[in-house]
Amino acid sequence: MKRNLLIFALLFLCMAIGAQTVFKNEEVEVSLLKEKTWVFSTWDYTTMYLIEGEDKAVLIDTGTRCADLDKIVGQITGKPLEVIVTHMHPDHAGCIKYFDKVWMHRADTVLVPQHAADYQGEFLYMEEGQVFDLGGRKLEVAWMPGHTPGSVVLLDKANGDCYSGDAFGSGEVWLQCVPMSPIATFHESCCRMEKLMK
């Protein structure tokens, strides 16, 4: 499993090095990672992804602080947009206020009072195996509790891409104290992820 995660991290690094910047301000730099895929790198070293299909687009995570994120996304794509948070921590869901509807896993609703109590929009709940069909491109939800109870990864199986938030990929095991996730839960998610990567 460590070998697979290392390969994934190296591939991501190689793609990021060759990325072309399409937008930059003091809070975020947006780069074209590959065709119809942009990475948003923020001042606090978190990342968001914009994935575009033929019919619509998906923004994965919203970062901590990025003024007018909706307008920045609108400069890149004019397609209807779905917004998904990989988990309900402020560095991944801090700018949900710019969007009327946000997809999250129901298990992370325990974090909403602490991290998104002021959100005026609507939460939509995604489930294991749910597919977001963008037109010519699909993202499948895989529930990976551990970092938070509702952590998810999004798999673009056709292109071999995985968008994991903080569930995996940082090189560290980062479990949270409140709410506490048993190490066994994280281990189960690691085993499931390893199977998905094969």
Where in this protein do the model-derived segments appear?
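Short glycine/proline-enriched coil/turn segments at helix->beta-strand junctions
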Residues: 54-55, 77-80, 96-101, 157-159, ...
